[in-house]
UniProtKB/Swiss-Prot annotation:
Function: Catalyzes the ATP-dependent conversion of 7-carboxy-7-deazaguanine (CDG) to 7-cyano-7-deazaguanine (preQ(0)).
HAMAP family for this protein: QueC
GO BP, one annotated term: queuosine biosynthetic process
Residues annotated as binding Zn(2+): 193, 201, 204, 207
Annotated residues for binding of ATP: 10-20
Cofactor: Zn(2+)
Catalytic activity: 7-carboxy-7-deazaguanine + NH4(+) + ATP = 7-cyano-7-deazaguanine + ADP + phosphate + H2O + H(+)
Protein name per UniProt: 7-cyano-7-deazaguanine synthase
InterPro entries (UniProt xref): QueC, Rossmann-like_a/b/a_fold
An MF annotation (GO) of this entry: zinc ion binding
Species lineage: Bacteria, Pseudomonadati, Pseudomonadota, Betaproteobacteria, Neisseriales
Record NCBIfam families: 7-cyano-7-deazaguanine synthase QueC
Keyword field: ATP-binding, Ligase, Metal-binding, Nucleotide-binding, Queuosine biosynthesis, Zinc
Enzyme Commission (EC) number: 6.3.4.20
Length: 224
């Protein structure tokens, strides 16, 4: 795919960094760009990690400001005074966790598509996952497929949205990183914690999923 270009929606977290590295290996570093969104998230470490990783991997990164979202929606990821539901993983079936940002992935895909078309890019890659999605409706395959159709119709352009992690568990995502030879890089350089704690708080839903998946992956490696 060396003659094709790809745009990765990139946050600096485990999933999007795994997708970025996979895209580099698939399309070639010179054909991959990253797009990151400043949407009013409650901590800066996520953006700092994304910038550092993009530079370290030698990938062009564009940062777009969507902080106006603070004016129209309320959630724990954007409100420093809100408590993050640590039991969100277990309670997701009974309601959407308070860390869900209404419209976030829809906006990310929309702005990514606008940017991609201007760059002559058709392939858009997102690290969303339906298997360990913490109850977020915009991480489901049906949503992404719907957005793909909508964007193609809206811009009369043949976008192809790829979600390589969609049906993988966190353990399988770690295993994918291991297969690409970057497990330690992902483990040491990416940021996942909802609370913005470097190294993780080990309490928020994101940290729990990450650590649980890593433990399962490492246990599987030992068993082989």
């Amino acid at each position: 795919m060396s003659n094709q270009k790809a745009l990765v929606i990139f946050s600096g977290g485990q999933d999007s960094t795994t997708c970025l590295i996979q895209a580099i290996q698939t399309y070639g570093r010179e054909n991959v760009q990253a797009i990151t969104f400043r949407y009013g998230q409650r901590h800066a470490v996520e953006l700092e990690r994304a910038e550092w990783i993009a530079q370290d991997l030698g990938v062009s990164q564009t940062v777009l400001d969507l902080s106006l979202m603070r004016q129209i929606t309320h959630n724990a990821l954007m409100d420093e005074t809100a408590a993050i539901e640590t039991a969100a993983i277990e309670t997701a079936d009974n309601g959407v966790p308070n860390t869900f940002v209404d419209g976030r992935n829809a906006l990310f895909l929309l702005y990514a598509a606008i940017f991609a078309k201007g760059q002559g890019i058709r392939h858009i890659i997102a690290g969303v996952c339906e298997t360990d999605f913490s109850g977020y409706p915009d991480c489901r395959g049906v949503f992404v497929k719907s957005m793909n159709v909508t964007l193609n119709l809206a811009m009369d352009y043949d976008f192809q949205i790829h979600t390589p992690l969609m049906y993988l568990t966190k353990a399988q995502t770690w295993a994918l990183a291991d297969e690409m030879g970057v497990l330690d890089y992902i483990r040491e350089q990416t940021h996942t914690c909802y609370k913005g704690i470097v190294g993780g708080c080990r309490e928020c839903p994101s940290c729990i999923l990450r650590e649980r998946g890593l433990a399962e992956c490492l246990e599987s490696k030992k068993a082989v």
